[in-house]
């Protein structure tokens, strides 16, 4: 028996290379491959890098689906099914809009593939009794089963030089706009620490990315994990929260374990907007500056993210956030417009208020990366998109990269630790290039250099 696993692209421009910053290792599919019995042959195709075949010589195809890849995934699946090959779909988009996903596949997995459900799907397929829907969320287990990913599938693909690892999944917070909250029902599941250490031991890269939704969901458990991975002498980064700065013991352990950078979602500098988002827990009474200094003092650089489009947001708020990120010497930053992901509380609110430009914006012909899919209060959709793009470009201008050079966290000592300085400069240059490439990148289609849809 042979299975083909496909990672769809967001979309492509014919004869143009795919965006480098979007080519991390696809951990979900290598994990799925790790769950697959040894007697099944696995073919792995990453459309971001590989060309899709015209015909599929395989027994079963598995496709992972995110909101931004959904349209492309459906096009691929429809072509494969027309050849008589059955398709199984899963991924976060299947959690958010299962009824939509189920229209484009023979079987759909809602929730994670661990816990025996993937083997159940394979057994049912072999016995010609495949069900339309499988739901692992019905059997919630706070312990997330560890699987050794098939990292051999990454060979010769040219991914970013980062080793991806997962220590937990989900997030306990309930932010209005967050698809993770909706997909995992604000629940967090952690893997066993000894299994994580074992997995890291199999990763050749010196820099790791913990692809957790929130690496510090439970401070006590994070400290235990840091103690366990410190002897491995790896550098790593992940997602955190600003309230980490309240726990000096945690920060020391993060630093000792090799943490060099954390992505922190500030989202807004306006307390009222944070409350509207459901992020009142992120309000820091002493101010962000002191907390950021504490993080820098522990050698932790910050990748700050901000989101705009709430009703009190204005051009001035974007400017204040940009100045704040530059003055605080953030290693990296993102200035994004609000995205009403399906299945989220934000999507439901905008739908009720009649503010969605298109109810299924992710499937709309002509939708491009950077397009705003709702009607903001203080901007036109085009103004909001351009304001966010301009802020990104200003943050990553050469003069502002130099301004953000900082030797406690971003670069350390450039003579004693040239790797950190090189990493800082490289990440900023790649980000600058990626911003230009991403803006107006086609979502869901392959287009030619003149914008004509090829497929």
Q: How does the language model describe each region?
A:
Residues 2-5, 41-44, 104, 124, ...:
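Radical SAM enzyme core and accessory elements
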Residues 147-303, 310, 323:
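Radical SAM [4Fe-4S] cluster-binding motif and immediate context
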Residues 98-103, 250, 312-327:
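Catalytic cores of alpha/beta
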Residues 44-46, 89, 238, 304, ...:
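A structural preference for short, hydrophobic beta-strand core positions in alpha/beta folds
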Residues 29, 73, 118, 193-196, ...:
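Aromatic/hydrophobic pocket-lining residues that form the small-molecule binding cavity
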Residues 1-204:
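Acidic, low-complexity intrinsically disordered segments
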Residues 35-43, 291-302, 328, 394:
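A structural motif corresponding to the C-terminal end of an alpha-helix
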Residues 8-14, 100, 220, 272-278, ...:
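Flexible glycine/acidic-rich beta-alpha junction loops that bind and position SAM and/or redox cofactors
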């Amino acid at each position: 028996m042979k299975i083909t696993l496909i990672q769809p692209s967001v979309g492509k421009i014919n004869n143009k290379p795919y965006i480098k910053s979007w080519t991390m290792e696809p951990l979900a599919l290598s994990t799925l491959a790790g769950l697959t019995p040894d007697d099944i042959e696995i073919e792995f195709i990453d459309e971001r890098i590989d060309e899709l075949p015209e015909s599929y010589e395989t027994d079963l195809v598995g496709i992972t689906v995110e909101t931004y890849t959904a349209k492309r995934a459906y096009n691929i699946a429809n072509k494969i099914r027309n050849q008589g090959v059955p398709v199984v779909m899963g991924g976060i988009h299947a959690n958010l809009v299962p009824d939509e996903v189920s229209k484009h596949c023979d079987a759909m997995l809602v929730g994670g593939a661990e816990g025996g459900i993937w083997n159940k799907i394979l057994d049912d397929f072999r016995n010609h009794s495949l069900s339309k829907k499988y739901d692992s969320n019905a059997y919630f287990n706070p312990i997330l089963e560890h699987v050794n990913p098939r990292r051999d599938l990454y060979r010769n693909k040219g991914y970013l030089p980062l080793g991806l690892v997962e220590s937990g999944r989900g997030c306990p917070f309930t932010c209005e706009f967050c698809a993770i909250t909706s997909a995992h029902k604000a629940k967090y599941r952690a893997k066993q620490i000894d299994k994580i250490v074992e997995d890291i031991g199999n990763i050749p890269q010196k820099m790791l990315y913990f692809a957790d939704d929130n690496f510090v969901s439970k401070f006590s458990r994070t400290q235990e994990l840091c103690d366990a991975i410190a002897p491995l002498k790896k550098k790593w980064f992940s997602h955190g929260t600003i309230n980490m700065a309240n726990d000096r013991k945690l920060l020391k352990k993060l630093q000792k374990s090799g943490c060099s950078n954390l992505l922190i979602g500030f989202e807004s500098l306006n307390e009222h907007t944070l409350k509207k988002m459901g992020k009142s827990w992120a309000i820091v009474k002493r101010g962000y500056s002191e907390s950021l200094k504490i993080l820098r003092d522990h050698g932790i650089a910050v990748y700050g993210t901000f989101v705009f489009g709430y009703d009190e947001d204005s051009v001035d708020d974007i400017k204040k956030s940009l100045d704040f990120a530059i003055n605080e010497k953030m290693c990296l930053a993102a200035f994004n417009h609000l995205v009403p992901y399906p299945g989220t509380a934000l999507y439901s609110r905008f739908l009720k208020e009649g503010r969605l430009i298109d109810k299924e914006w992710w499937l709309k012909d002509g939708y491009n990366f950077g397009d705003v899919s709702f009607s903001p209060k203080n901007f036109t959709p085009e103004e909001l998109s351009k304001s966010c793009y301009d802020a990104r470009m200003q943050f990553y201008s050469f003069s502002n990269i130099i301004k953000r050079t900082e030797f406690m966290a971003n670069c350390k000592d450039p003579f004693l630790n040239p790797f950190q300085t090189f990493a800082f400069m490289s990440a900023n240059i790649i980000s600058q290039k990626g911003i230009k490439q991403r803006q107006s990148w086609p979502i869901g289609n392959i287009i030619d250099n003149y914008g004509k849809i090829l497929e």
